[in-house]
Amino acid sequence: DFSGNVTRAMRAIDGTIVLVCASEGIMPQTETVMKQALRERVKPILFINKVDRMIKELKLTPSAMQERFLKIIDHFNILIEQIAEPEFRGKWKVNVADGSVIFGSARDNWALSVGFMKKKNIGFKEIISLYDGTMSDDERKKWIWEKAPLYEVLLDSVVKHLPSPVEAQKYRIPKIWQGDKESQFGKDLIECNKNGEVAFVITNTIIDPRSGKEINAGRLFSGTIKEGMEVYLNNEKKKQRIQQVLVYNGIKPESVGEVPAGNVLAITGVV
């Protein structure tokens, strides 16, 4: 049960990729996570994962696979219709044609969307042929890396369909923050103003195994965080000085001088 982690993470993000198993469909835990996301006004896109199982284990025909995909997509959109607020229902439903639905195998590191298939001139026939025994593992990996790499398809879809912080904070702040929206601070939050007062929400704290220091990760909604700057801790009712400002390159934290509003980052020196 990751619901506590999910709740904290929802404050730090504006969009999410929802993974659904192609064989099992949308499970109750996935529905719970979708409810949390939609109630926080976090926009979802759909990744139908483990398509390789449908080919290798279930040995489904292309038409049977298509039927399974459509059932998952319909279920996903029904949940959006039931849970999302009226202003987002129509805009946030996913469909295959615009690339907000992705198919793939995270384990085998490939993915496809309609737009990507057109760009690369490939289809599911080529994917099915990957598992017919005519290719070695090295040949399959080479084909995937050249033709349908997971990272490229996912990132293309994220850039195209998920909102920027500047766009998202306009409709998310009124939902997740109960302060005065007409105050200067409220306007800074809504506008994602990098020159405004610092508003950093810590969503996770870990201990660096090398240094033993606490690393506090979270979302910067307003202002610019800089190394050495003094910040006010709202819960502790005291001021402390930031030692390091970090951004993550994959899972590796890298020190930077400063980070503006709208980013996910980490800091040290604040306990």
Summary of predicted features, one role per range:
Residues 1-271:
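Structural and coupling elements of P-loop NTPases
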